[in-house]
């Protein structure tokens, strides 16, 4: 327990220390982008700096959030909300990205309202992480099935997709920090998305599970229904 606490504190402190100089780098890159630069090579350097600094910023933010979520050191405000509306809104944000990746999203959900107790900001992040994961790793030209159903007093959200490559990894390993299904590391990402989603779901008294069967990936969120 002490070891985990020390590791979490170290990650938080290091992330904070890196964030300060990174902010300066990002600000200077923004200033460089506003300058008129005729040299194409220099323009390309600025573009790479901009992209990679944004990537590093996202990684640091994920690190800090994963650290806080895993220890419960994060504010959670539960309130009754419509799971159907939340799911529809977040999935809608990914329509263009999914289309760009040649993915056909099929959503099956009952008419609202379907009420659960959750923190809107954290539930958004959980679904957002799952959709981001799908857009990165799903096989182009396939369908992504997302469903919301009520069963025995529970509200269950299920996300199913076919992976680009066979998932030679257990569901437990996939939810560990820094682990990615793409072992070749051909896609950008921190490997923290599923770990954060699992921790945040638990903090909202929900359940987060993953099932893997060959190249079939399934993520299941479940919360008690409220009336």
Briefly describe each language-model feature range:
Residues 77-81, 99, 104-114:
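Conserved catalytic submotifs in the C-terminal HATPase_c
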Residues 166-180:
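Short conserved segment of the HATPase_c
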Residues 141-153:
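Short beta-strand/loop element within the Bergerat-fold HATPase_c
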Residues 71-76, 115-118:
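Conserved micro-motifs of the catalytic ATP-binding
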Residues 77-91:
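A conserved beta-strand-to-alpha-helix junction within the catalytic ATP-binding
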Residues 134-135:
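Short helix-loop "hinge" at the ATP-lid/N-box region of the Bergerat-fold HATPase_c
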Residues 205-214:
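Glycine-rich ATP-binding loops of the HATPase_c
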